[in-house]
Amino acid sequence: MLANPATKYVPFAPFARDFSERTWPSRRITQPPIWMSTDLRDGNQSLIEPMSVERKLRFFEQLVKIGFKEIEVGFPSASQTDFDFVRKLVDEKRIPDDVTIIVLTQSREDLISRTVEAAAGAKQAIVHLYNACAPAFRKVVFNMSKDEIKQIAISGTQWVKQYMAQHPETQWRYEYSPEVFSTTEPEFALEVSNAVADVWQPTPECKMVLNLPATIEATTPNLYADQIEWMHKNLARRDSIVLSVHPHNDRGTAVAAAEFAVMAGADRIEGCLFGSGERTGNVDLVTLALNLYTQGVHPGLDFSDIDEVRRCAEYCNQLPVHPRHPYAGDLVFTAFSGSHQDAIKKGFAQQKPDAVWEVPYLPIDPADLGRSYDAVIRVNSQSGKGGVSYLLEQEHGLVLPRRLQIEFSRAIQRVTDETGREVTADDVHTIFNREYLEQHSPWKLVRHRIDGDPAGGQGKQFSIQVELDYNGERRVVTGSGDGAISAFVAALGIPVRIMDYHEHAIGTGTDTRAASYVELRVGDSATGFGVGIDRDIVTASFQAVLSAVNRHLANGVTVTESETAQAA
């Protein structure tokens, strides 16, 4: 890179003075633009291996299913494959009556004739003619004057009218693009556009499409919006023109440029699904449409099965959609960060059906796009208690008390730090089982018998007889207390203090099980949790006590021989 890039690059300034008449910044988008997909033309021509007719047909059908009413289907004068594909659509009557196909051509008579021939017979079609108008193209590519460039556009428009007239069975419309509008002097772009409209003679009932492409994205999006608003206000036949934009993504701001352009007066947007197209791609129509959706404006396009749309695009383009791609990527609804997971978990818990969507970190409900919530929270070394507990609750119905969430997250953290990898929901459950439910040494519950009501009652004493396995040795102990758990602890004969207790049901009906969570202290040790799960709530609570005691002992808490002997 140069130490001083100003010696090689200069900023593009579309206006000699500041365009202070702008009004677009205060506007809002309250209805969708006309959408035109150019996946089968601009998207296709940018592929290493252009689509076969079979792949183009599959993509076309997907675009129709999504709801596109204008689809650019090819460049038939430049490719026999494109010509054959357009004819297949027309001859086999594959174009719905409410869909208009668009065919692109350069401004040469033989190419225009071939283009019209390709689309002739369709119920409705648009011929899209373009020629470059920017200074660099006039000087470097064509070595032509402004008048010569303008004449190319005028002549091309005249030829289009001539050849369309030979096929009255089709309802024809016309689209003109001053290519590289983004770096063309606004006054010259206006001059050429008005000259083309003078030849075409559009009316409010039969409008011409004037497309203003950011063929090369050369400025910040606000300057592109200024250019669009200036054209919008100065076109001679504005009421007879559909003002269209075609932003490319060279600077990475095509979506913003398109949104600003609509605010500035554009009626129509051309682009591709997932931003396919030359170089860095065209504007992404999926992102644009779903940005509108998240603002309460239905885009008129259906992405309720976003994964199907993505699979189709990946197959037809032979290119993957990035896992972080807005709305459609594998990871866009996934949180690894602990604080994010905690906020999402709380948001899901508070979100009411049919209420305004207010789940933190998720700008859209994944279910609206056909996504499940399974991958919303995933666990790695950056995760915290919220994500871990969410997975256990969603996948296994375990609702952990807050302090247990914190304690168990440390066990997960140890695993992720040691392995450096993500742990799945199944991994989390396996670690939970190992940490809490498989702690059977040295104490394991065999059976018990209680004299009294396990539900308890004020002032009521319970007697219990418990059979335990202590390191393979069977022992029978007895105890009493004012509740089942206190009687069980008394029978153990170990200095245990119950600090907290939680329980809940897992499942419903005949498959219901009880989950018990006990926080206790052995002697003067720190507190720790144990967990028990059983069809019987009392059995589950006893298992939870033994789970906690065994975990304490495994972590180095000692119990004297006399204390252990009391349980003999």
From Swiss-Prot:
Gene3D superfamilies (UniProt xref): 3.30.160.270, Aldolase class I (3.20.20.70)
GO molecular function: 2-isopropylmalate synthase activity; acetyl-CoA C-acetyltransferase activity; magnesium ion binding
Domain Pyruvate carboxyltransferase: 33-307
PROSITE patterns listed in its UniProt record: AIPM_HOMOCIT_SYNTH_1 (PS00815), AIPM_HOMOCIT_SYNTH_2 (PS00816), PYR_CT (PS50991)
Gene Ontology terms: cellular component: cytoplasm
Residues reported in the UniProt entry to bind Mg(2+): D42, H246, H248, N282
Subcellular location: Cytoplasm
Family of the protein in this entry: Belongs to the alpha-IPM synthase/homocitrate synthase family. LeuA type 2 subfamily.
Name the record gives this protein: 2-isopropylmalate synthase
